[in-house]
Amino acid sequence: MRILTLPASFLLAFLLYLPFPSVVMLRDRALCALHARIVRLFTGKKGRADEKAALAFFLLALSGCAALIGAIHPLCAAVICAPVFSAPACLSLSASVKRTLDSGAFADNFSDYEAQVRETCADFAPAFVTGACAPMVLLAIGTPLYLGSALAWAYAGLCACAACCPAARRISEAISRAAESLFVVLLVLCCGAVGRNPLRTDGKGARSRLLSILGIADGEARTHAPVSGDIVQAAFLCCFCMVLLAVLLSLVLLPLV
């Protein structure tokens, strides 16, 4: 049953974050508060904190608790890993943006309308890189060793503390860069789902590649002016990529678990 942990946790994330997108902020706030308390424990008499030791202890405590809960049962692992997949939260936020655009709020300023569409579509890329692609790969890597929950939550802790801890920022950015490269490959493979030829798209990063696939990037790849329907296409394409990745990782894990 451990093979079902990855797809089940991703599905549960949709059930959690679609109706309650603000849970992402609550999760990150709680992780930052926990990290701050641990930093105080590692603060010496001179007022200097050993940030690296504090970060190591924070990650060990966080991943250790996740690993213990996940080892109870695969269903427990799926439940405990669901909050790590924060990407579905951006779907609710983008839906509210689309409703605003469709209401005619930008009827008098079409340039702002286009900028809002382009920005909303581009924001899907980092959200799915850090909130779906990276934790999904880490969960898959750790699953054969019963460390999937630990690695996924360790990454969530690193991302939450990146703003206040330089070491956490460096590690999380390194993981995110690798995940972004994988996500770009998935976008190219799946761009046919929105009727685009992969050979006619460009862009170095995930944001520019996504806009190019949608046909709303600046340059030769642009096929039309940005409209609110592009937000739906961007959401569908990103979700399609993650479903494909979940299937591929599950097939890879099949002989290992």
Where are these regions (language model features)?
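Hydrophobic N-terminal alpha-helices or hydrophobic patches in metabolic proteins across all domains
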Residues: 1-257
